[in-house]
């Protein structure tokens, strides 16, 4: 079924970090030691020295010349993501409220455990998540710590939390839409 989502004049994507882990072989050994891909990511003793994270800044220009920005995912290792956000000016954009929302694609460690790096600069930012988020994912957003996996957030989210049901097209704004899918993925999420 086709759905008209409107149009925008341009889209720009800035890759802040696409390095989920620094050494693939070391990451695979970490996964094997933990018991394989079906373990609960929240209980794995992840090698912090090998963690990076995924995050991108999406900027669109509307037909009227207006500009909008959102952040796609928050990365993994907070120290790594703090440096990446500072390098790209994301920290300042968050502090100035120039980034409209954070869109979390899924709660895997390399896309979500870096949530504190976003919230330290904008705890009230609107966050969009799949409606399939697990309880521990919500707990991290509220400020929980999971010492065994080195995941923690000292900056509880105070803004709006928008949940998207799977398989529904959500118009975010003209020319930009979202669809999430409920898939069987590894690491217990």
Task: Give the location of each predicted region.
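Zn-dependent metallo-beta-lactamase
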Residues: 1-67, 177-178, 182-186
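Short, well-ordered coil/turn elements that cap or connect secondary structure elements
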Residues: 8, 65, 122, 156, ...
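Structural motif
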Residues: 11-14, 69-70, 101, 125-126, ...
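Active-site metal-binding loops of divalent metal-dependent hydrolases
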Residues: 17-19, 74-76, 107, 132-133, ...
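Short, glycine/charged-enriched secondary-structure capping and boundary segments
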Residues: 28-30, 86-87, 117-119, 141-144
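Pre-active-site segment of Zn-dependent metallo-hydrolases
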Residues: 45-52, 60-99
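Active-site metal-binding motif and surrounding structural segment of the metallo-beta-lactamase
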Residues: 79-135
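Metallo-beta-lactamase
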Residues: 132-189
């Amino acid at each position: 079924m086709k759905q008209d989502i409107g149009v925008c004049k341009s889209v720009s994507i800035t890759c802040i970090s696409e390095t989920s882990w620094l050494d693939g072989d070391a990451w695979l050994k970490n996964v094997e030691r933990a018991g394989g891909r079906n373990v609960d990511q929240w209980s794995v003793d992840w090698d912090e020295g090998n963690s990076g994270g995924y995050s991108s800044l999406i900027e669109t220009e509307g037909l009227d010349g207006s500009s909008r920005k959102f952040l796609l995912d928050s990365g993994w290792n907070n120290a790594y993501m703090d440096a990446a956000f500072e390098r790209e000016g994301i920290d300042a954009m968050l502090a100035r409220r120039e980034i409209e929302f954070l869109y979390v694609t899924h709660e895997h460690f390399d896309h979500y455990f870096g949530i504190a790096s976003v919230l330290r600069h904008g705890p009230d930012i609107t966050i969009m998540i799949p409606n399939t988020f697990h309880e521990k994912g919500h707990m991290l957003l509220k400020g929980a710590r999971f010492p065994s996996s080195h995941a923690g957030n000292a900056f509880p989210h105070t803004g709006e939390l928008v949940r998207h049901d799977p398989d529904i097209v959500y118009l975010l704004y003209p020319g930009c839409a979202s669809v999430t899918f409920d898939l069987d993925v590894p690491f217990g999420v």
